[in-house]
UniProtKB/Swiss-Prot annotation:
Quaternary organization: Homotrimer.
Signal peptide start-end: 1-23
GO cellular component terms given for this protein: periplasmic space
Keyword line: Chaperone, Periplasm, Signal
Protein name, per record: Chaperone protein Skp
Alphabetical list of InterPro entries matching this protein: Chaperone_Skp, Skp_dom_sf
Family to which the UniProt record says this protein belongs: Belongs to the Skp family.
Name of the gene: skp
Length: 169
């Protein structure tokens, strides 16, 4: 009976020590980054912004020209409307309406094209960030890296943002 109790105790000790070993193995090193901070620090971000402004400069200038033309015609209608004949006033109003429609269509197309290009470029930049995060996480021995937007608290020593920024630059 005593031997049975000793054997059971020994079995429990071995079992509990193996459970502790498994628990220690299961502990993972978790870090975090502030993706927005890293994104703002990207040197490529400014280059991409300038490239996009250059790409859409002509279309923006065209919109400004349409807007200026419409403004000129509206001012002419206000200034000379009383002196103009009914047909001329009606013709000018139609032209203003057409310019307004043209402006709205072109502005919407520019907005959509700009948003699409911005999304494409952001996707490329986030890929750069992901690669840098992976590189830093592997180098530092982190199993998981979260974004600050998905967590409540993290010890400052597990913040990898600055290390990721340095890896990108």
């Amino acid at each position: 009976m005593k031997n049975m109790i000793k054997a059971a105790s020994l079995g429990l000790i071995i079992l509990s020590s193996s459970m502790m070993a498994n628990a220690a193995e299961a502990a993972q090193k978790i870090g975090y980054i502030n993706t927005a901070q890293v994104f703002q620090a990207l040197p490529q971000r400014e280059v991409v912004l300038q490239k996009m402004q250059e790409e859409f400069k002509d279309k923006a200038a065209e919109l400004q020209a349409i807007q200026a033309d419409a403004k000129t015609k509206i001012e002419k209608l206000k200034r000379d409307g009383q002196l103009m004949g009914q047909d001329e006033v009606e013709k000018l109003r139609i032209e203003i309406g057409q310019l307004d429609s043209k402006y709205k269509i072109k502005a919407q197309a520019l907005e959509q094209a700009s948003a699409r290009r911005e999304a494409e470029e952001k996707q490329k930049l986030f890929k750069v960030i992901q690669d840098a995060v992976k590189k830093v996480a592997e180098k530092e021995g982190y199993d998981i890296v979260l974004d600050t937007s998905s967590m409540q608290y993290g010890k400052p020593e597990h913040n990898l943002s600055e290390k990721v920024i340095k890896a990108i630059k």
